[in-house]
């Protein structure tokens, strides 16, 4: 190898190993290291969660195998009981989830309604509202008006009770004192009430006024002239009696019976309706027949008579 060729070869290798130029961006190793550390932690957490889930699934698999073996070894009644128990548990779990959701919805709607009612409340006004004070009536008390004084003799005679008759003048003196004071006070055992006595006496004292005599004049009687100058009007022809709409059907007279002795006592006499029968055809058995009476012939299938 020539010296010049060797120098040119080693010079090309050295030029390729030179430092980077300013145009290439510098790498931040600290930030990349932190991001890698965070990713490593996340992967570790995922790994722990996966291991826990795997352990849980293994335990469930073991429990299911045991239950399957128990079902295989158990009798028919035990199998039915286990199936019913599992279904009841699943239904109860489903009902618990629904109840939880329902409670959450009710609470949410209650909060929404509370907010709506708060928005609808009127704003407080600046006016001060007070209760009006109670007005007391300060009117003067009036004494009871005295009742009209009646003649003492009539009042005493009407309102005398058997107790007053026995007491004598003491009761009359007390009555006069009450009349002088104003309102008469009757005895406790009065025969009539105070109000009835007052109205009775007022009706008696009303004077009767005579009604003034009024003369009535009778108006003269006027006769209207007849329409036609001729004689009296002709009489209308008498009405005919109304013919009845429905005529009562007449039944034919019964045929005369020649000899009663010829007919036996057990046979019933012929009726007048038999005259209308044009043929001797027997009645149909489908329709209802007449119940036999005591004068009919004895029936062949009946032992007793009616």
From Swiss-Prot:
Which lineage do the record's taxonomy fields give for this organism? Eukaryota, Metazoa, Ecdysozoa, Nematoda, Chromadorea
Record's compositionally biased regions (Pro residues): 230-241
The reply on keyword S-adenosyl-L-methionine is no
The region called Disordered is annotated at: 122-196, 223-306
Q: Name one GO biological process term.
A: meiotic chromosome segregation
Organism equals Caenorhabditis briggsae
Pfam families this protein is in? Answer: Shugoshin_C, Shugoshin_N
| Key words, A-Z | Cell cycle, Cell division, Centromere, Chromosome, Chromosome partition, Coiled coil, Nucleus
Kindly provide the name given to this protein in its UniProt entry. Shugoshin
